[in-house]
Regions:
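Charged, amphipathic alpha-helical coiled-coil/dimerization segments
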Residues: 72-115
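Basic amphipathic alpha-helical segments that dock to polyanions
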Residues: 41, 56, 71-77
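Residue-level detection of beta-strand scaffold positions
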Residues: 38, 62, 67-71, 82, ...
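N-terminal helix-turn-helix DNA-binding core of bacterial DNA-binding proteins
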Residues: 21-66
Length: 115
């Protein structure tokens, strides 16, 4: 990798970090959510409100152990539910409270992402 390519990667990372910081602040202030929580809930909602945990981890491009760390507080606050499906695998379901909060937070995210 050339120095220019490395610098381009570092610049992209810092831009991404700044965006996440701003979105964490906006969503946290108004809805008590982190950007990562919002993304997870959005992906779950787009999957029809429920998905196997392994599929969710794959879609989010995160290890299953990291997904579990994200899910535990969301489950504790009643936004999602984890349960074994018929195959003994874990299935994650977006609860009504989570769907409501997601739809409320969507306007904040749209406003924050607007140029």
């Amino acid at each position: 990798m050339s120095e220019e390519a490395l610098q381009a990667c570092l610049d992209r990372h810092l831009e991404h970090a700044a965006m996440v910081f701003m979105l964490d602040d906006e969503l946290g202030t108004h809805h008590g959510l982190l950007w990562a929580d919002f993304v997870l809930l959005t992906v779950l909602d787009a999957a029809g409100g429920a998905a196997p945990a392994t599929e969710l981890a794959r879609t989010l491009r995160t290890p299953a152990s990291h997904l579990l760390l994200r899910l535990l507080p969301l489950e504790k606050t009643g936004l999602v539910e984890r349960a074994a499906d018929g195959d003994g695998k874990r299935r994650v379901t977006l609860r009504p409270q989570g769907r409501r909060l997601l739809h409320e937070a969507r306007d904040t995210a749209v406003d924050a992402c607007a140029p």
